[in-house]
A protein has these predicted regions:
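Active-site neighborhoods and metal-handling regions in enzymes and metal-associated proteins
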Residues: 1-380
Length: 380
């Protein structure tokens, strides 16, 4: 595995820069602050990783400070976890974390909320400080998160390289008679052995007609000698995701599949070619559908054809902005990273999804992983 090298890391200096940009947004919009919940946005800005529960834990970012809002009995644990320096403020079991936040914000200021916060906590804050003082912080937060830094792109690249290597090992493993559950277990083991955060974040392994279901079928499957194979999997490195899909057959000769595979690859290439700085995300989805329409597939979301959007952003979340979908007029910018996967579904027969990811540079699009070479050659 010649791609292996030291794993890139997000430094404290980079997190401080992110925080500085967030504060610029806070001041620019006349906010008292932004409240981050136990979401990937908390990790993005502060480095603190926390799994959500009914007890609120998060961070209040103001123009001059960062304060961590922590259940009293969790203080010692939080102090041991990596996070940017800031005051730790405690609330006890009989107290209201929403009331504590209201006191910190003070009178009159508006508080922008992490859009990953649960609805029940929004209601608690509205009761404590008034709904008119709450604002949606999602646009500000996600506007920063969707432009990846060089370090973030390096982490995604590392994760993609790792998963592509696992895909190659799967291809070598597959033979008629193997069960999909065996392959899923193998994928997880290989990701773990290669150093992924928690093994596979997911693994979809489908054979035959099950490949026509975009997210796979329930139950175990056995690979037949003439089955179409779809493998979609990914992992995380320091929180950043990979996500790659390959669809292929072990032997050639199925003309219907091979023709459909080449249409899929043509559509995938059309998305790449349409990816230009300033282009609307929707235009990439349109490019894929034009290819399919040329081959009498679709139109729109009709089957046989493409039943879903052509791609999604990824980073600390496997699905995040920007979304490559109709109606999204977000302009592509350098640093954006997103999938290219205009799947073609032939109901109850087979589906073909070739998924590779793109990062936008000042000079245009760049593949994280080279596209598949052919219907029986899943790697370049």
């Amino acid at each position: 595995m010649s791609w292996q090298h030291s794993v890139p890391r997000i430094t404290e200096d980079e997190r401080q820069l992110r925080l500085s940009k967030l504060r610029q947004g806070i001041e620019g919009e006349g906010l008292a602050g932004v409240l981050l919940g136990p979401t990937e946005s908390l990790r993005y800005f502060t480095g603190l990783v926390w799994h959500p529960s009914e007890r609120f834990l998060g961070a209040l970012v103001t123009p001059s400070a960062i304060s961590y809002i922590v259940p009293g009995f969790e203080r010692s644990r939080v102090e041991t976890l990596p996070h940017l320096p800031g005051e730790i403020l405690l609330w006890e079991e009989e107290e209201s974390s929403a009331a504590l936040i209201s006191r910190l914000v003070g009178q009159g200021g508006r508080l922008a909320l992490d859009d990953g916060l649960p609805l029940y906590f929004y209601h608690a804050l509205a009761a404590a400080m008034g709904a008119e003082r709450l604002a949606d912080g999602g646009r500000l937060i996600r506007g920063l998160r969707r432009i990846k830094s060089a370090a973030e792109i390096a982490l995604i690249q590392y994760a993609m390289n790792l998963t592509l290597d696992v895909h190659k090992q799967v291809h070598a493993l597959l033979k008629p008679g193997i069960r999909s559950s065996e392959v899923v277990d193998f994928i997880d083991r290989q990701h773990r052995q290669a150093g992924a955060d928690d093994g596979s974040t997911f693994a979809i392994v489908s054979f035959g007609a099950a490949t026509s279901l975009p997210h796979g079928a329930d139950g175990d499957q056995v690979l037949g000698p003439s089955d179409v194979i779809l493998v979609d999997t990914g992992c995380r490195i320091d929180g950043y995701h990979s996500d790659i899909t390959r669809t292929y057959m072990l032997e050639g000769g199925d003309r219907e599949f091979e023709r459909a595979w080449r249409i899929e690859r043509e559509a995938q290439q059309a998305v790449f070619d349409a990816a230009r700085i300033g282009a609307a995300c929707a235009s990439l989805d349109d490019a894929a559908r034009k290819v399919l329409a040329k081959h009498s597939l679709g139109p729109d979301y009709r089957l046989p054809g493409l039943p879903h959007r052509a791609g999604h952003g990824l980073g600390l979340e496997i699905h995040e902005e920007p979304y490559i979908v109709r109606g999204n007029d977000t302009a592509l910018a350098a640093g954006m990273c997103f999938s290219n996967e205009p799947m073609i579904v032939f109901p109850e027969k087979f589906g073909i999804r070739l998924e590779d990811h793109i990062t936008m540079t000042e000079d245009g699009p760049r593949w994280f992983t080279d596209p598949a070479a052919g219907p029986t050659e899943p790697f370049a």
